[in-house]
Amino acid sequence: MSKNQEKYSQLRSIIPEMRRVKHIYFVGIGGAGMGGIAEVLVNEGYKLSGSDIAENAVTQRLASLGAKIHIGHREEQVHGADVVVVSTAISADNPELLEAQALRIPVVQRAEMLAELMRYRHGVAVAGTHGKTTTTSLIASVYGQAERDPTFVIGGLLNSAGTNARLGHSRYLIAEADESDASFLHLQPMVSVVTNIEADHMDTYEGDFEKLKSTFIDFLHNLPFYGVAVMCIDDPVVRELLPKVGRKIVTYGFSEDADVQALNFVQEAYLSRFTLRRAGVEDMEVVVNLPGQHNVLNALAAIAVATEDEIDDAAIIQALADFQGIGRRFEQLGCFDTNKGEMVLVDDYGHHPSEVAATIKAAKAGWPEKRLVMVYQPHRYSRTRDLYDDFVEVLSQVDCLLLLDVYAAGESPVPGADSRALCRSIRQRGQLDPIFVSDSEQLLSLLPDVLQAGDLVLTQGAGNIGAIAKQLSLSSLGFDLAASGTGKE
């Protein structure tokens, strides 16, 4: 028996297999959340297949691991499956879903399958409107540095691992908990993190913010009585909920009453430095290889979780300093020398006004001498409508703004909640003259005339703007360019 097989055998003695399940089929397998769970399952030894409308990096990776991937949804493809996994993005008339129901094959949500993976493990679930992916990644990195060998399922690419999911050989499972469809209520972790709570995905909660808050309380009460809730006390809504949580609480933040507190924050380009204060131990100096106060909060959450699990401080400090980032989370795609001077290209997934504001703040703090050029793609008409005034306020804070049309994500257009309307409203404020861009081709043709020496170019949004950012290669900009570095200053 090989060393890996021996580890797998030991894991099986801790984590029982799902009874009678051998073949698992994923409808929409190419999504980050679905693909991450699928990767863990295929590595656990299950026969795995699934479908999506197009090939992508996730489907290619799963195919390389032995999964059978179908492009397109056809009813016969679910034949032989013992269970079918779907996400809330799959419509009720999907032919594979209908066939599974007709054949009485069990159909479960993505979160139910994640809950099954977590059921026999020491689960750490990270919830919140913003910061889930980064916080989950930091926790996974700390546990990896401490040789706890965790399983993790993350909504973004963890650069150090080259994947967003990994099967470890220990009892630990670290995962994001999705509040967008309330599916995080399926999870029963040992540790729950709440980073912040804002009005987002309000259709799920019938437009009722109180219902959203009470759902977070229900999520925290899924913890066993011996579990731990790790909560950001800097967030006013989270602070408001603290008295309603009937579990052990560990708070974190910049606030003086935080159990895990950051002081003396300084940002130096991509790095964040701060003093860590916890009761009963000496203060420590910490360096996080991520920019911005919002990422210090994410690091504090990881520190709080690790401290509760008695992970050595040396491992925590090393993991945070060595952190290699996550795909599309303030990801520097390069520092380039052009015939107009050096420019920095950064790509970020944030698509809520608070997330965009945090990214802008980090960019200005780390590179105060640079002109900030943002290429923003709004995500969903409903979000643009519901947070319209906030978007106008936040997007007005950059030096130059190019607005791509809304990435619909399956929604129908909403009059007055599109990028042309945003352009008009921002222009009326008199601070900025934004440029509406109809598509990526027009963007690539416009940029050479817009950019100046020393610019920091920030592509921002949750749609296909990430793919567009990759297109902003040396030749695409129409300059005589040569890469000058790896991206980090």
Curated annotation (Swiss-Prot):
Q: Name one GO cellular component term.
A: cytoplasm
What catalytic activity does the UniProt entry give for this protein? UDP-N-acetyl-alpha-D-muramate + L-alanine + ATP = UDP-N-acetyl-alpha-D-muramoyl-L-alanine + ADP + phosphate + H(+)
One GO BP annotation of this record: cell division
Q: Cite the Gene3D superfamilies for this sequence.
A: Mur ligase, C-terminal domain, Mur-like, catalytic domain, NAD(P)-binding Rossmann-like Domain
Sample GO molecular function, one term:
ATP binding
Against SUPFAM superfamilies, the record matches this protein to: MurCD N-terminal domain (SSF51984), MurD-like peptide ligases, catalytic domain (SSF53623), MurD-like peptide ligases, peptide-binding domain (SSF53244)
What does the UniProt keyword field contain?
ATP-binding, Cell cycle, Cell division, Cell shape, Cell wall biogenesis/degradation, Cytoplasm, Ligase, Nucleotide-binding, Peptidoglycan synthesis
What does the record give as EC number?
6.3.2.8
Top-level class of the enzyme under EC nomenclature: ligase
What intrachain disulfides are recorded?
Answer: none
Its UniProt pathway annotation is: Cell wall biogenesis; peptidoglycan biosynthesis
Among NCBIfam families, the record links this protein to: murC
Which protein family is it in?
A: Belongs to the MurCDEF family.
Cite the PANTHER family for this sequence: UDP-N-ACETYLMURAMATE--L-ALANINE LIGASE, UDP-N-ACETYLMURAMATE--L-ALANINE LIGASE-RELATED
User: What is the protein named?
Assistant: UDP-N-acetylmuramate--L-alanine ligase
Please give the organism. Shewanella sediminis (strain HAW-EB3)
Traced from the root, the source organism's taxonomic lineage reads: Bacteria, Pseudomonadati, Pseudomonadota, Gammaproteobacteria, Alteromonadales
